[in-house]
Amino acid sequence: MKDIYNQILKLQLQIKYHNYMYHTLDSPIISDILYDELYNKLLQLEKLYFKKKSLDKKIKLLDQVGAKKLHIFTEFFHKIPMLSLRSINNISDFDLFDKKIKEYFKHINVITYFCDFKFDGLAVNLFYKNGILISASTRGNGSVGENITKNILMISSIPKKIAGSNIPKKIEIRGEIFMRKSDFFILNQSCKLSGKKEFSNPRNAAAGSVRQLNPEIVKKRKLNFFVYGFGLFDYNKKIDSHYQRLLQIKKWGFPLYKNYCVCKNKKEVIHFYHYANKIRSQLDFEIDGIVIKLDSIKLQNNLGCIEKYPKWAIALKFFSLDKETKIFKISFKVGRTGIITPVAYFFPINLFGVSISKASLYNIKTIKLLDIRLHDYVTVYRAGDVIPKIRNVLIHKRNKYTQKIIIPTYCPSCCTKLIFSDDLKTCYCPASFSCFSQNVKRLIYFSSKNGLNFKGLGKKNIIKLINYGYLYTPIDFFSLTVKKLKNIFRMGDKLSEKIIKNIAFSKRVSLDKFICSLGIFGVGTSIAKRLAYYYRSVEKFFNTNYDTLSKIDHIGYNISNAIISFLKNKSNRSIILKLIRILNIFI
């Protein structure tokens, strides 16, 4: 039972992290399919655990999974929870969904579904009182979102005042903010010309735009909105149909996309799915599937919800389209914690209007599993219509010119001997701050929110300080002066003084933040908290050993090995000792 519990904890942390990356930072690092696999695995493990162990359901870990809001925006509490949809990727899973619905409502002869496109944008909740837009917010964790009203007011397709008669006293309108492909292309061309970072896809561009602090930027980005549902519906006329409610919402001036379908049977739903899949490449906006809902509001309420999903609705996703290309280079990148990540470079292909020329292979095991070789022909797809991924190698096209990939044993940046994990799945460089590739990223991480949080000193400024020779190790942050900042950034006295004061203020830091700021392989915020709770002092952590680490929950061999290797490194020890003298570290 302990093994199952530990697996649940591990999956919970993974899903929380991916929720944060997707919903809060708008920067997903795994595909929707892989996310769904993790979530479904968590569901299965919880069922098994709580079946065998009689515990209060309130402590179920899955209920804690959600995306926290950024602290840039204020909180908004949804009147009715803004739930996510469970995703499926094949028609046989829809058959199962349909079967369960019909079994539950045996007394009803015809079950009617409402189907529409699953827009790939940012879900928003619009709250109107007496016909006036009072607030707009993101989904957040389903109960609490970010108040983005000022930015939403800049989107012309969102009514600021409800038109028509019989306007409800209170209503929550739910829909998707998106960017058209044509506008996305123009935006990226503009970013390219001005030397700014390009957006990876229209969804990230839309979500990133809505979270801008300057509403004028939102206005320039030409964002659009389609309504797909509602939360609170305080209306004097009783309307039991989801479809009829949407038609009423359309009469009030909200944009409802023309392609939807009221389906009387399973066959009509599947026909609509194939139709949507066929035309999606012709649309000027991204869709990644269709949404299937029970049309009757009464039946929806009877079914209710499970965990964070409604039982009466489901998202049927499209299969990703593959394209063939040829690999011409494999490089090994050094990450912040020293992790070595193989990246495949191939001749550019175009998938849904996006040019793709490389894909991460994630780890060494992927190379072995796929048997990827240099000059191989491969099929590439966008996982979840977002992340480029190699599906398979076209072995029949392999010729005598292909070359086996040689896995490095020494760091490509600093030539330090690499350390391999037990399962040989991953390897990392233990040189830490002595490795240039790591050092730049480590210094950025040290100053970030997960570290000491030096406000006002961003990534670009840190890179400049490194290039000018002012930053080599974390200690150098504390020897920065107003004069140095003014020389490099041409800042005024006030801003320079503010940054120096912020750095001085950050000298008082909790032990878990300090441990996390070091950027040890495998030690993120949650593990850092466990270590801080166990050791209670920086000196005890600094002098730890394998035996002590093995007693701490969730600290396995690989993490223990990484911690010991990091703390044994002479350069690291010197840096940590100096930091201990400079900082005021508390529990």
Curated annotation (Swiss-Prot):
Keywords, sorted A to Z: DNA damage, DNA repair, DNA replication, Ligase, Magnesium, Manganese, Metal-binding, NAD, Zinc
GO molecular function: DNA ligase (NAD+) activity; metal ion binding
A biological-process GO annotation: DNA replication
Catalytic residues, chain numbering: K118
UniProt-listed SUPFAM superfamilies: DNA ligase/mRNA capping enzyme, catalytic domain, Nucleic acid-binding proteins, RuvA domain 2-like
Catalytic reaction(s) noted: NAD(+) + (deoxyribonucleotide)n-3'-hydroxyl + 5'-phospho-(deoxyribonucleotide)m = (deoxyribonucleotide)n+m + AMP + beta-nicotinamide D-nucleotide
Positions bound to Zn(2+): C411, C414, C429, C435
Named cofactor requirement(s): Mg(2+); Mn(2+)
Matches recorded under Pfam families: DNA_ligase_aden (PF01653), DNA_ligase_OB (PF03120), HHH_2 (PF12826), Nlig-Ia (PF22745)
Broad class of enzyme this protein falls into: ligase
Residues annotated for NAD(+) binding in this entry: D32, I33, L34, Y35, D36, S84, L85, D116, R139, E176, K293, K317
Xref: PROSITE patterns: DNA_LIGASE_N1 (PS01055), DNA_LIGASE_N2 (PS01056)
EC number(s) from the headed UniProt entry: 6.5.1.2
Primary role: DNA ligase that catalyzes the formation of phosphodiester linkages between 5'-phosphoryl and 3'-hydroxyl groups in double-stranded DNA using NAD as a coenzyme and as the energy source for the reaction. It is essential for DNA replication and repair of damaged DNA.
Family: Belongs to the NAD-dependent DNA ligase family. LigA subfamily.
Name of the protein in question: DNA ligase
Organism the protein comes from: Buchnera aphidicola subsp. Cinara cedri (strain Cc)
